[in-house]
Amino acid sequence: MTALSRVSGQAPDRVVETYAEGKPYDLFFLDVAGVRLVGRKTEAAYPGPDRDGLPAERLKCALVEARMLLGVVERDQVAEDHVAVFHRPLGEAEKAELFAAAVADPTTDLYYPYAQLGDRVRETEEGGWEVTDESARELDHAEEVLRDHVPDRLAELGFRGGVAYDAACSTGAFLQAVGRRFPGTRTIGQDLSPAMVARARTRLDEAHCGDGIRPAIPEASADLVVCRHLNAFVVGTGQAHDLLAAAASRCREGGLVVLLGHTPVLVSSQWCEMSGLTPLQRSGATPSGHALFQCYVLRKG
């Protein structure tokens, strides 16, 4: 008996998040094996799973785990003060089976349909974030899984180096990891925050201070474009679409564009396709397979 046939006999349930006190932005959908699953993001084992005698750190970050899944979506309802998702509940065995299928398929779509609902705090201030040594360390730590995954995945997809541009480079650690994986790559970063740019200049070939809506490099000049600024709590959805268009214009035909981040990506893979970017990957997995995270790898043209 398959996981889905076991679930079909379950009575429906619902998960509710209010806008005033709840966190609708923590609800995620996972499209796998022809069905849509709903889950709620909580703290995950980071960067890897628990091991005997060595429990992992718990961190609320980009990672989602099988235990966070709730059920098979039947419908959702967006009301005046809350969002509700009606679903057929999953047992632990069904969660594990479907999650393993998602881990095995990088085209599995993991997304947050209510990322812009609820009482959210916009993190980005005019002129970028204030940066301290501690906050820079925290940012780099929360990005460790992404830095480990993306360069290897790029190699699997045939990337061999060239010009790599990060439209919101933060401390520069992410693009530095790409440069290390592909020697000879010219790494060019840009960030709204002068403090971030100062840190990035110690790691990258170039780092420019400025808004990503005005990219610092010429059109069609990059072999790889990284977007880590199209996320909830950072920008609005319309702004994310505009920023993607600006960044993607700097990618050459046949080049790669990567979308990811600590918080939900606001641009859908369908929007990317409509913009001339072909999805090669929609989600990434940790080496152990214990967790998934949003990670679009797109080919231009």
Curated annotation (Swiss-Prot):
Q: Which UniProt keywords apply?
A: Antibiotic biosynthesis, Transferase
Listed GO biological process terms: antibiotic biosynthetic process
SUPFAM superfamilies from the UniProt entry: S-adenosyl-L-methionine-dependent methyltransferases
Cite the annotated pathway.
Answer: Antibiotic biosynthesis
Q: Which domain of life is it from?
A: Bacteria
- Knockout: what is the outcome? Disruption of the gene results in complete loss of nocardicin A production.
Recorded catalytic reaction(s): these are: nocardicin G + S-adenosyl-L-methionine = isonocardicin C + S-methyl-5'-thioadenosine + H(+); nocardicin E + S-adenosyl-L-methionine = isonocardicin A + S-methyl-5'-thioadenosine + H(+)
Q: Could you tell me one molecular function GO term of this UniProt entry?
A: transferase activity
Annotated signal peptide: none
InterPro entries xref list: Methyltransf_25 (IPR041698), SAM-dependent_MTases_sf (IPR029063)
What EC number(s) is this enzyme filed under? 2.5.1.38
Q: What does this protein do?
A: Involved in the biosynthesis of the beta-lactam antibiotic nocardicin A. In the presence of S-adenosyl-L-methionine (AdoMet), catalyzes the transfer of a 3-amino-3-carboxypropyl group from AdoMet to nocardicin G, forming isonocardicin C. Can also catalyze the transformation of nocardicin E and F to isonocardicin A and B, respectively, but in vivo substrate is probably nocardicin G.
Describe, as the record does, how this protein assembles with itself and its partners.
Answer: Monomer.
Q: Please report the name of this protein according to its UniProt entry.
A: Isonocardicin synthase
What lineage is this protein's organism placed in?
A: Bacteria, Bacillati, Actinomycetota, Actinomycetes, Mycobacteriales
